[in-house]
C-alpha cells in the first residue's frame, strides 16, 4: 500500500494525545513501514518506540497508522506545502489508490 512512497519524506497531520506504539521487542521483530522524522517532540509527538508512525502485518494486508493521512490529501490541507509544487492531490493519495487496486485484484 505504501511501496510507491518508499524513501519519501512527507508532512502529515497528527492529532492524537493518547496513541502510542509500545513495542517491547527489538525493532527487527516488527514490520515498521513508516517512521516519524526524528525521535522526540514535535516530530514524534507521542514518543512511539522506534519513531514508529505505521505498522503492517506480515502479509501487508493490515496497516495501523497513527498519522492522519486522510487529512493530508490536498495541498491546502497542509500547514506547509513546498513552493513550486503543482500537485492536484498530495502524495498520500497513493496509499488509498493502492488499497483500491489491491481490493479489485482480490475480489
How would you name each of these model-derived features?
Residues 1-107:
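Amide-donor transfer/coupling interface in amidating biosynthetic enzymes
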Amino acid at each position: 500500500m505504501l511501496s510507491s512512497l518508499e524513501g519519501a519524506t512527507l508532512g502529515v497531520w497528527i492529532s492524537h494525545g493518547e496513541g502510542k506504539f509500545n513495542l517491547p521487542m527489538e525493532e527487527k521483530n516488527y514490520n515498521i513501514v513508516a517512521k516519524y522524522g526524528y525521535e522526540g517532540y514535535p516530530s514524534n509527538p507521542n514518543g512511539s518506540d522506534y519513531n514508529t508512525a505505521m505498522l503492517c502485518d506480515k502479509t501487508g494486508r493490515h496497516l495501523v497508522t497513527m498519522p492522519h493521512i486522510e487529512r493530508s490529501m490536498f495541498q491546502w490541507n497542509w500547514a506547509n506545502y513546498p513552493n513550486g509544487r503543482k500537485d492536484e492531490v498530495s502524495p498520500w493519495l497513493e496509499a488509498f489508490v493502492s488499497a483500491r487496486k489491491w481490493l479489485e485484484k482480490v475480489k
